[in-house]
UniProtKB/Swiss-Prot annotation:
This is Glycerol-3-phosphate dehydrogenase [NAD(P)+]. Catalyzes the reduction of the glycolytic intermediate dihydroxyacetone phosphate (DHAP) to sn-glycerol 3-phosphate (G3P), the key precursor for phospholipid synthesis. HAMAP family: NAD_Glyc3P_dehydrog. It catalyses: sn-glycerol 3-phosphate + NAD(+) = dihydroxyacetone phosphate + NADH + H(+); sn-glycerol 3-phosphate + NADP(+) = dihydroxyacetone phosphate + NADPH + H(+). It comes from Bacillus cytotoxicus (strain DSM 22905 / CIP 110041 / 391-98 / NVH 391-98).
Length: 341
């Protein structure tokens, strides 16, 4: 049994806390809303983020970060990308020994273009880090909370660390594979949110299945193109954290990025969309970060660029589609590097 604290009591953090509790671990969950923490402790429900789901009574919720981290050597971070640095800075004030840092968030920091594992390594002193591990894959919180079959990937630089996290989470409904490609796993999980927004726009405009299939396929090409340039393994993007996550996020009504895009496609403004969602839409911030990163790395990402214009330059969604369809002719298949070298 492992004592583990989940940082972030949204839908995904709560669902993962359930998986860990089902596996017999000593699970704590921290959130910054005392009333929500009280509800988890007394009613065993997170009505705001997972209404109707009964949580294991063994999950203990804290609104005090210091209390939540007492005698804990493993943490699971599940907070919005924009909150990471602030949360990490608060955490390092109250921990004293090395920890395994698992994160299950999907995003890139605008301005710095940093992946989340890089933010952890920048903010937390080296002597307080045992390992940094990423948990990612096609996984809607609503389905995990219902204990429906789900498969994800655990990625770390040190394979033993990825396997330790694999063992923490594996059970009859939650299967975990391992992958040493932490760069590819993080980028796949983050960048697919951009394509999910675009897929929602496609559906909102009523463009049909042909257009959506093309968008998803060419979107995966963009993800892999940037991922390769950043040092990711091309094969990772054909796996759970690339193609798998892209499929589930672009095709499900559970996806908040798809829902946001769908509203944009139906004519709502970005401000209206974000006000109505009630939860973070990571794809909006990730679009900005990925656009900046693609410019910096000189990587062609036309779908990302078109979505950036829609979100931040006020371009009409129909005009954005027209500009993509009217691009100069291209070859479909790009050269794949020899991975045996």
């Amino acid at each position: 049994m492992t004592k583990i604290t989940v940082i972030g009591a949204g839908s995904w953090g709560t669902a993962l806390a359930m998986v860990l509790a089902d596996n017999g671990h000593d699970v704590r969950i921290w959130g910054n809303r005392p009333e929500l923490m009280d509800e988890i402790n007394t009613k065993h429900e997170n009505k705001r983020y997972l209404p109707g789901i009964t949580l294991p009574s063994t999950i203990v919720a804290y609104s005090s970060l210091e209390e939540a981290l007492v005698d804990v050597s493993t943490v699971l971070l599940v907070v919005p990308t924009k909150a990471y640095r602030e949360v990490l800075q608060d955490m390092k004030k109250v921990i004293s020994g090395p920890m395994t840092w698992i994160h299950a968030s999907k995003g890139i920091e605008p301005g710095t273009s940093k992946r989340i594992s890089e933010m952890i390594e920048e903010e937390i002193p080296e002597h307080l880090i045992r390992d940094v591990v990423v948990l990612s894959g096609p996984s809607h919180a609503e389905e995990v909370a219902l204990r429906q079959a789900t498969t994800v990937t655990s990625a770390a630089k040190r394979m033993e660390a990825a396997e330790e996290v694999q063992d923490l989470f594996m059970n009859h409904y939650f299967r975990v594979y391992t992958n040493p490609d932490i760069i590819g796993v993080e980028l796949g999980g983050a960048l697919k949110n951009i394509i999910a927004l675009a897929a929602g726009i496609t559906d909102g405009l009523g463009l049909g299945d042909n257009a959506k299939a093309a968008l998803m396929t060419r979107g995966l090409t963009e993800i892999a193109r940037l991922g390769r340039k950043m040092g990711g393994n091309p094969l990772t993007f054909a796996g759970l954290t690339g193609m798998g996550d892209l499929i589930v996020t672009c095709t499900s009504v559970h996806s908040r990025n798809w829902r946001a895009g769908n509203m944009l496609g139906k004519g709502h403004s970005l401000e209206e969309v974000l006000d109505s969602m009630g939860m973070v839409v990571e794809g909006v911030r990730t679009t900005k970060a990925a656009y900046e990163l693609a410019e910096k790395m000189e990587v062609e990402m036309p779908i990302t660029a078109a979505l950036y214009d829609v979100l931040f330059n006020g371009k009409n969604v129909k005009d954005a589609v027209g500009s993509l369809m009217g691009r100069v002719r291209k070859h479909e298949v790009e050269a794949i590097p020899d991975l045996s070298r």
